[in-house]
Swiss-Prot record:
Protein name per UniProt: Putative ankyrin repeat protein FPV222
Ranges occupied by ANK repeats: 38-67, 103-132, 136-165, 169-198, 202-231, 234-263, 294-323, 328-357, 361-393, 397-426, 430-460, 464-493, 495-524, 529-559
A family per Pfam: PRANC
Keyword Repeat: yes
Keyword Repeat attached: yes
SUPFAM superfamilies named in the record: Ankyrin repeat
UniProt entry keywords in alphabetical sequence: ANK repeat, Repeat
Length: 747
């Protein structure tokens, strides 16, 4: 049934505060309880506008103050809101950005309060029920309790308002007064019987809200009245989503009514207690404040916020310091460390908080202490240790605080943890030790501290793939590799995990070359898990020096790797476009080998299928024959020097210096470079030894009880060969003769 024109006109007159016209229509017999298209009664509309004369007129004509209007609201609900959204809308529309919510409240609160009290009294006198609830079961007392109007609350209580009435969200009026940080109203409600320990649907009590807004006075009041210090609330995710949608609705409403110029004031209103009448919870407004931090456990929030006074109050009233937040299992002890609240940590320990509590990730406070800045972490670790903390407890990933300290390069924490007896060899779920983390994240200072401590086993790892030496190689960190080698790390993982193959495949020639020259035990004849030999990867690098190093370290090109397959044939089959210099080098090596092995036969058969290879082979073989013809003595030839070049000693060759100096290496150009590396130092060594012998003849004589000059020349050389060339040169130099004491050699 539609609304009559007369009723519509009457509503228009009410909105315009036209008392004369309203009286005229009412006297014509129009029902004062009629509703408009928005489902609002005339009385509710008049109350919303705060038109006292029209309200009185409607009541005098029989308007019922208990009829529900839009959102199940009664006029008494409306008048309990000291500053309604309609008023705010008008202000914004009229003044735009010139008006602020705080300014308006400060200026007009008392005026609004007095006017609203007058209206409320009129409604109650005309039968308004004070315990009526709206669609969210919010009563006028709930609204008044968050409005800041002590007098309005007092009026409602005087007429029997229920202090323990619950909203649909399970909240009493105390939740509303506390969330508005109103000490006086909260105290009044408690005096009138409000239960201080009622928890809403998210298990949030008034005390939790008081801690949330950091109100020391409210916390004291509630604790004095028996509030449960150990209540645990829940996160309010669903509530936040719901209220965000509600915010969008109010913004749409304002936009529809062209109230969209003062965004700041709108947001302030949405986050204020003035809008509580349309919220699901008293705590909703708090969520939209920039400084908001949700509280589920009073003691943890007090610690998070760094409120020493609040924390001590809670603990004094018997709060358990070891209650954790349900969603994160985080304790106050964790927050004291994470937020760098040293005094808070001290307070918690003083009240016997457990130092080794674990959160959801099984981290202890010590795990977080090592993540603090280097300048601060040890201070927290020392306090924790003094209180009995263990530094060997592991988290969900099997890591101790030392693992974490190494990961974050907290060198001071690493030193302190080691000094405190922390186990340096615990392996986590990734098979990482603390050393692994230091190497993995390239924390060179930390690696040095760990290795120099003498407590670390550099070879400890469950899988060779995660060996520190392999990690260092993967990260191309030569400094860490040096430290590990100096600490005696086992180099087997390099061979077993194909570390050299990996470097060659990645074209990391610098580190590959350095490792080959530095570590003598490296395997150069192995194949990786793809059955590719190291030499094949090196051949693709086109770096002849690295290939030479492989050969010097024992690359066996005749090694049989399969049916009719050798290391040499694999290099050619796996590598395309080999450089001429590398081909010549490989052929020269084969040509110098004995001709009776199975591998040699396979290689020779392959060489004979290629004209270029065969030509190079014949050239090399010709030069090998020449070297075999150059005899140095006792059946020893130049080819013997070449074949034994990796093991032959310079002192041995020095004895053949006279013969070596007469050899023209230009006759063997392919092998010349490798022979010169041996022959030139041998000739130089011989000269130094000979000069040292003569010097010794001059400075040592019989009357000084030395019998040097009586020794055969061969014995003299044998003795001098024990000295390195540097010391021999010092002996020869006239300025240092008197500084050298050789008596320990001869006596």
């Amino acid at each position: 049934m539609g609304i009559s024109d007369k009723v519509n006109k009457l509503f228009n007159f009410i909105c315009k505060n036209d008392v004369v016209s309203v009286r005229k229509y009412l006297e014509k017999g129009i029902n004062p309880n009629e509703k408009n298209k928005d489902n609002c009664t005339m009385l509710y509309t008049a109350v919303e506008h705060r038109y006292i004369d029209i309200i009185k007129l409607l009541l005098d004509h029989g308007a019922d103050p208990n009829i529900y209007s839009s959102d199940h609201m009664t006029p008494l609900h409306s008048v309990s809101v000291i500053i309604p959204i309609r008023k705010i809308s008008k202000l914004i529309t009229k003044y735009g950005n010139l008006v602020t919510l705080a300014n308006y409240r400060n200026t007009f609160f008392v005026y609004n309060e007095n006017r609203n009290l007058e209206i409320a009294k009129m409604l109650i006198q005309n039968g308004a029920l004070v315990n009526m609830n709206n669609m969210k079961n919010i009563t006028p007392l709930h609204i008044a309790s968050s409005s800041g109007s002590y007098k309005m609350v007092e009026l409602l209580l005087l007429h029997g308002a229920n202090t323990n009435a619950l909203t649909s969200y399970g909240e009493t009026s105390l939740h509303y007064s506390v969330s508005s940080n109103d000490l006086n109203i909260s105290e009044l409600l408690i005096e009138n019987g409000t239960n201080v320990n009622v928890a809403n649907k998210d298990s949030i009590t008034a005390l939790i809200i008081a801690v949330e807004i950091m109100s020391i006075d409210l916390v004291r009041l509630l604790l004095d009245k028996g509030a449960d210090t150990n209540a645990i609330g829940l996160e309010r995710f669903k509530l936040y989503v719901t209220e965000t949608k509600q915010n969008n609705n109010i913004l749409k409403y304002l936009n529809t009514n062209n109230v969209n110029t003062n965004v700041t004031m709108i947001n302030e209103y949405i986050a204020s207690e003035l809008y509580d009448w349309n919220r699901n919870s008293a705590t909703s407004k708090l969520m939209f404040r920039s400084c908001f931090e949700p509280c589920t456990v009073p003691v943890t929030l007090a610690t998070r916020k760094g409120s020493k006074e609040l924390l001590e109050i809670l603990l004094e009233y018997g709060c358990n310091p070891d209650i954790c937040e349900k969603t994160t299992s985080t304790y106050a002890m964790h927050y004291a460390v994470i937020r760098k609240h040293y005094e808070m940590l001290n307070i918690l320990i003083r009240y016997d908080a457990y130092t080794d509590v674990k959160d959801r990730q099984q981290n202890t406070p010590a795990h977080y202490a090592v993540k603090l800045p280097i300048s601060e972490s040890c201070k927290y670790l020392k306090l924790l240790k003094l209180a009995g903390a263990s530094f060997n407890l592991t988290n969900r990933k099997g890591r101790t605080p030392l693992h974490t300290a190494c990961k974050y390069n907290n060198t001071e924490a690493v030193k302190y943890l080691i000094e405190s007896g922390c186990d340096t060899n615990i392996v986590d779920v990734m098979s990482f030790t603390p050393l692994n983390y230091a190497v993995y994240y390239e924390r060179e200072d930390t690696v040095k501290i760990l290795l120099e401590s003498g407590c670390v086993d550099p070879n400890l790892c469950d899988y060779k793939e995660v060996s520190p030496i392999i990690q260092a190689i993967k990260r191309n960190n030569k400094n860490i590799i040096k430290m590990l080698l100096n600490a005696g790390i086992d180099i087997k993982p390099i061979n077993e995990c194909y570390g050299l193959h990996m470097l060659a495949a990645l074209h990391n020639k610098d580190l590959l070359k350095w490792l080959l020259c530095t570590i003598s035990e490296l395997e150069v004849n192995g194949v990786d898990d793809h059955y590719v030999p190291l030499a094949s990867y090196v051949a693709e690098l086109s770096d002849i020096r690295i290939m030479e190093i492989l050969i010097e370290k024992g690359l066996d090109l005749n090694k049989v790797t399969g049916p009719d397959e050798t290391m040499f044939t694999m290099i050619f089959s796996a590598t395309s476009d080999l450089r001429k210099s590398i081909i010549d080098l490989l052929i020269s090596q084969i040509a110098a080998d004995e001709e009776f092995s199975e591998g040699f036969k396979i290689n020779k058969n392959m060489i004979q299928t290629d004209k270029y290879l065969l030509r190079v082979y014949h050239e090399c073989k010709n030069q090998v024959s020449k070297m075999g013809e150059i005899k140095l003595g006792d059946g020893f030839t130049m080819i013997d020097i070449y074949k034994n070049r990796r093991s032959i000693h310079v002192n041995f060759l020095a004895r053949y210096a006279m013969q070596l100096s007469t050899i023209d290496l230009r006759e063997v150009p392919i092998y010349r470079k490798y022979l010169e590396i041996l022959i030139n130092p041998a000739i130089k060594r011989h000269k130094i030894l000979n000069a040292a012998k003569d010097t010794m003849n001059n400075i040592l004589h019989r009357k000084e009880k030395f019998y040097w000059n009586l020794l055969p020349v061969e014995i003299k050389f044998n003795i001098l060969e024990y000295l390195n060339s540097k010391d021999l040169i010092s002996l020869i130099h006239s300025n240092t003769v008197n500084e050298i004491d050789l008596s320990h050699i001869f006596i």
